Structures are given as C-alpha cells and as structure tokens.
Regions:
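Short-chain dehydrogenase/reductase
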Residues: 69, 131, 181, 239-242
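C-terminal helical subdomain
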Residues: 197, 212-267
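Structural signature of the Rossmann-like NAD(P)-dependent dehydrogenase/reductase core
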Residues: 6-7, 85-86, 145-151, 194-199
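N-terminal Rossmann NAD(P)H-binding glycine-rich loop of SDR-like oxidoreductase domains
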Residues: 7-19
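Conserved Rossmann-fold cofactor-binding substructure of NAD(P)-dependent oxidoreductases
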Residues: 60-77
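Rossmann-fold cofactor-recognition segment
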Residues: 46-63
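Conserved glycine-rich Rossmann-like NAD(P)H-binding loop of the short-chain dehydrogenase/reductase
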Residues: 22-40
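Catalytic loop of short-chain dehydrogenase/reductase
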Residues: 89-135, 139-190, 202-205, 209-212
Length: 267
C-alpha cells in the first residue's frame, strides 16, 4: 500500500492526480484543498472511493499544513510515501505585462509588485511550508519521494529560445522553486529522500472564455522552436507521464529539474 498527498487537488492537474491514483484501491490518497466544498467532482470521487480523503490546507498557512499532516499521520500511522506539491499561484493581474511595460507606469508597477509578492508566497514559501510539514512523515515512509510541480518557463535557456516575455512573476518564482528543491535535496540525500521538480508540460487546465485563444497562441509560439509540437496535453496524460518519470527516479536524481518525460524537452 502506497500513500500519496496532493496539494491543489480540487481541479486541473491536482485533481487528475487524485483520479489516477484512486483507481488503485491499495493506494491511500489525500487531497489537500483550500476549501473542502469547492470541488463537487472531488467530493463525488471521494464518496465513491474509500481510499480518498479530502483535507483542508491552504499551502500559504503553516498552521493548516501542520494540521493536515497530523490528520494524514492519524490515518497512516505516522508515515507518507509520496508528496506531490501542485498548488500554485498561476495567473495574476500582471500576467500579460512584460518588464518593460512597467517603465514609467506606476500603476502597472504596483500591480506587478503585488503579483510578485503573491507568487513568492504561493509558489516559493508554500513549497517550504508544505515540505516541512510533511517531511517527518516522508522520512518514515517506504517510498520517500517528493514531487514539486515546476514549469518550463523557469528554464532561462527555454525562455530565451521561445522569446517569452510575459507572466514574469510565475516563471521567476518557479525558477526560485527549482533552487529550493535542489537545496532540499542536498539536505535530505542522507535520509534517502528523493525530491525533484518536474514540469508537467503545456497542459489544458484553463476553461475560461479566453482559454482557447491562449492555448492557440502558446502552441504557435512553441511550434516555432519545435514544429512537431502537437499542442497541450490533457491533465490525465500529463499526470501519467509524470508518475512514470517519478517512478524511475532515485535519490541520485534528487534536486533535478526535469520535464514530464524525465528530460529537458519541455514540449
């Protein structure tokens, strides 16, 4: 029996992890969400799968994360095998701004600064808080793996190749997350804990009215560097690939920043 805890589990990639893992009745799956009543599909899934447990945990709150870890410990007997840190601050008001858009524009600068602070809290500090809350359980687990969701937009070489100019707070904060993962790996290697950062690829998680145009735009950008790029993955396909990659990684791979395919091909 393998136990998993997934943050940001109410929708998108996080929910896809829960659906995938719940299919194996020998798994014990913990879905961590900010609001336990925010996702009817998750509630329905938990109702039909006794191995799924929904827990409240805002990843910016160390207190809520500690409480969630305590709840997990009560069910598993003090252990956790795999932690997937998926929750993130993705798209703020400044997502469309380039850095040069801020020049001479105090209002945009203020909005950008706020988004960057939210990204620090939601993407960087959240990883520290989440990892620290569950680390005692992970150390006692059998698998001892932590997967932190990153993005190809955190790779400077890729950003230069793609000529990507916007959503700076997200990409910059995820680049910092990759460093946090590397530092954790250095500290945990002697404990046999494998912690890695994986990009899920371009995944079709947005369903708003603007989403189709956004995915078409991004797909065209990526095809300039990789003409064979087929477009966004479904959350289910991305999760399948990431779990396959995670299963192959060992403590010797700790601290690495890889794609869903286990390499540096972000597309």
């Amino acid at each position: 029996m393998v136990s998993y805890a997934i943050t940001g589990a109410s929708r998108g990639i996080g929910f896809a992890f829960i659906k995938h893992l719940a299919q194996d009745p020998s798994n014990t799956v913990f879905a961590l969400v900010r609001n336990v009543s925010s996702s009817q599909p998750l509630t329905d899934l938990a109702a039909s799968h006794k191995n799924v447990h929904i827990l409240k945990a805002d990843v910016t709150s160390p207190e809520e994360l500690d409480a969630a870890a305590a709840a997990v410990s009560q069910i598993t007997g003090g252990t956790l095998d795999v932690l997937v840190e998926n929750a993130a601050f993705l798209i703020g008001e400044a997502a469309s701004f380039t850095l040069t858009d801020l020049v001479g524009d105090p209002e945009k600068t203020k909005i950008f600064s706020n988004d960057l602070q939210l990204s620090v809290e939601g993407n960087i500090l959240s990883v520290v808080h989440t990892t620290n809350a569950f680390l005692p359980l992970i150390k006692k687990g059998e698998v001892k793996k932590i997967l932190v969701i990153s993005t190809g937009l955190a790779d400077t070489d890729a950003v230069i190749e793609w000529q990507w100019k916007d959503n700076v707070p997200y990409g910059a904060s995820k680049a910092a997350v990759n460093m946090v993962v590397a530092q954790y790996s250095n500290a945990l290697v002697e404990d046999g804990v494998t912690i890695v950062a994986l990009s899920p690829g371009l995944v079709r998680t947005q369903t708003q009215d603007w989403a189709p145009a956004f995915y078409e735009k991004v797909t065209n950008i990526f095809r300039k560097s990789k003409p064979s790029f087929e477009g966004p993955l479904s959350p289910e396909e991305s999760v399948r690939l990431m779990l396959e990659t995670l299963g192959k990684l060992t403590v010797k791979d700790g601290g690495k920043f890889l794609s869903q395919n286990g390499n540096k091909d972000w597309l």
